[in-house]
């Protein structure tokens, strides 16, 4: 038996496609939504001005209840003040509520899309690699996706950026995760065969601005790399073919040199169309 667990606060643009890419390969899907961000603030110092922090443009609860009617899908509210071990906590919640436990659990984000049959391949790979507790995938990060385009764009592969994480429950005494679904021991075991699409740079412009402002606030709280405040205006909203240095971190913009043309393979396109 396999479960999938999602967490979502914003970004409903691609969650239907994401769920459709895995629903035939899992027994249950738990979608946990939060109405509050990890870090709450009423105002934010942004571009040398103090502004009101915007309201989440997505009514996530309403969207989920309207679009997901399958008996496989369970929708729950969950609020927290840190993403640290969030997936581990979410698994504990559903495991305590269900008598029958799965052999595998998949931790997913709402902007991640598997290719057709790719989750089955990932499951087989983890099964055969008996020494691993979990396995993750690298990501093809699509830049400003447009369904009408034959050619879309992507950024170069970021080799240490983990995608969805599949855990083998019988090999794990307790699931402890970092901010993502990867193990808190920081070791990432990447699949040799499977990559997924990440659509996180392709949300609508209102959601992208909200995501950007959350990153500005959250980076200050956790002491992460300072966010380039002009990224949204100059790099994303105002992007064209000549735009370079796309990383959001101030001082590290060159880590993503530029976006380049990319024809999305059919195994992913079956869910995007």
Residue spans for each PLM region:
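Short, well-formed alpha-helical segments that are part of the catalytic scaffolds
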Residues: 11-44
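Short beta->alpha connector loops
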Residues: 8-14, 172-173
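Catalytic-site signature of metal-activated, phosphate-bearing donor transferases
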Residues: 83-95, 103, 111-273
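Short hydrophobic beta-strand elements that form part
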Residues: 3-6, 31
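Short amphipathic alpha-helical segments and helix-helix/interface helices
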Residues: 16-20, 61-65, 95, 122-127
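Active-site-proximal specificity loops/subdomain of glycosyltransferases
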Residues: 2, 34-104
């Amino acid at each position: 038996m396999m479960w999938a667990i999602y967490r979502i606060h914003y970004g409903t643009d691609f969650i239907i496609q994401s769920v459709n890419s895995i629903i035939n390969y899992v027994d249950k899907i738990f979608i946990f939504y939060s109405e509050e961000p990890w870090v709450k603030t009423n105002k934010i110092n942004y571009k040398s001005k103090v502004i009101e922090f915007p309201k989440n443009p997505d009514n996530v609860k309403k969207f989920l209840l309207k679009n997901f009617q399958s008996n496989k899908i369970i929708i729950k509210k969950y609020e927290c003040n840190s993403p640290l071990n969030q997936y581990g906590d979410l698994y504990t919640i559903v495991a305590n509520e269900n008598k029958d436990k799965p052999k595998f659990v998949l931790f997913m984000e709402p902007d991640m899309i598997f290719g057709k049959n790719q989750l089955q391949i990932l499951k087989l790979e983890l099964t055969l690699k008996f020494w691993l507790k979990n396995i993750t995938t690298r990501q093809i990060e699509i830049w400003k996706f447009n369904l009408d385009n034959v050619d879309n764009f992507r950024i170069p592969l970021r080799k240490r950026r983990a995608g969805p994480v599949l855990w083998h429950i019988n090999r794990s005494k307790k699931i402890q995760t970092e901010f993502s679904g990867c193990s808190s021991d920081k070791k990432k075991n990447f699949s040799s065969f499977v990559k997924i699409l990440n659509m996180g740079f392709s949300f609508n412009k209102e959601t992208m601005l909200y995501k950007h402002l959350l990153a500005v606030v959250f980076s200050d709280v956790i002491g992460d790399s300072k966010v380039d405040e002009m990224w949204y205006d100059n790099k994303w909203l105002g992007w064209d073919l000549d735009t370079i240095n796309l990383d959001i971190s101030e001082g590290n913009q060159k880590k993503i040199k530029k976006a380049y043309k990319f024809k999305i393979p059919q195994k992913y396109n079956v869910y995007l169309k």
